[in-house]
């Protein structure tokens, strides 16, 4: 099993798809990494040679991925909260940040509905 950036890449997948298991690498970046490392996109991860894996590791190392990227995102959110910006307050309250409506919908961000006390006579 290939290990790149601290992540076990699934051996049955093609190299391009397998690289997307790494946080911070999507399809486009995975394709560019494979092309730069001279690895065929359709080659399965289990069939990659040690030299090819090493070339892929070198190219992945150029990007901010996994733990470093997660930390960077968290620090950016924390900075917004500390500055007291509108976006920071929305993050803090667990509401949508990018201007979406909240009167209806937004259930993913707000969580499950809370039971309201009924005011029946």
Curated annotation (Swiss-Prot):
Keywords for this protein: Ribonucleoprotein, Ribosomal protein, RNA-binding, rRNA-binding, tRNA-binding
Any one GO cellular component localisation term in the record: cytosol
One GO process term, biological-process aspect: translation
Tree of life domain: Bacteria
Chain segments annotated as coiled-coil in the UniProt record: none
Protein's UniProt keywords contain RNA-binding: yes
InterPro entries linked to this entry: Rbsml_uS13_C, Ribosomal_uS13, Ribosomal_uS13-like_H2TH, Ribosomal_uS13_bac-type, Ribosomal_uS13_CS
Region Disordered, annotated ranges: 91-121
GO MF entry, a single one: structural constituent of ribosome
Family: Belongs to the universal ribosomal protein uS13 family.
Subunit field text: Part of the 30S ribosomal subunit. Forms a loose heterodimer with protein S19. Forms two bridges to the 50S subunit in the 70S ribosome.
Cited function: Located at the top of the head of the 30S subunit, it contacts several helices of the 16S rRNA. In the 70S ribosome it contacts the 23S rRNA (bridge B1a) and protein L5 of the 50S subunit (bridge B1b), connecting the 2 subunits; these bridges are implicated in subunit movement. Contacts the tRNAs in the A and P-sites.
NCBIfam families: uS13_bact
Protein's recorded name: Small ribosomal subunit protein uS13
Native organism: Bordetella petrii (strain ATCC BAA-461 / DSM 12804 / CCUG 43448)
């Amino acid at each position: 099993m290939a290990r790149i950036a601290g992540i076990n890449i699934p051996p049955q997948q093609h190299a391009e798809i397998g690289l997307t298991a790494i946080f911070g690498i999507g399809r486009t970046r995975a394709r560019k990494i494979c092309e730069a490392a001279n690895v065929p996109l359709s080659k399965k991860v289990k069939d990659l040679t040690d030299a090819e894996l090493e070339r892929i590791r070198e190219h992945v190392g150029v990007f901010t991925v996994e733990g470093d990227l997660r930390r960077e995102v968290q620090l950016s959110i924390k900075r917004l909260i500390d500055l007291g910006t509108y976006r920071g307050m929305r993050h803090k309250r667990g509401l949508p940040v990018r201007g979406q409506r909240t009167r209806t919908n937004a259930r993913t961000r707000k969580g499950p509905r809370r039971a309201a006390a009924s005011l029946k006579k």
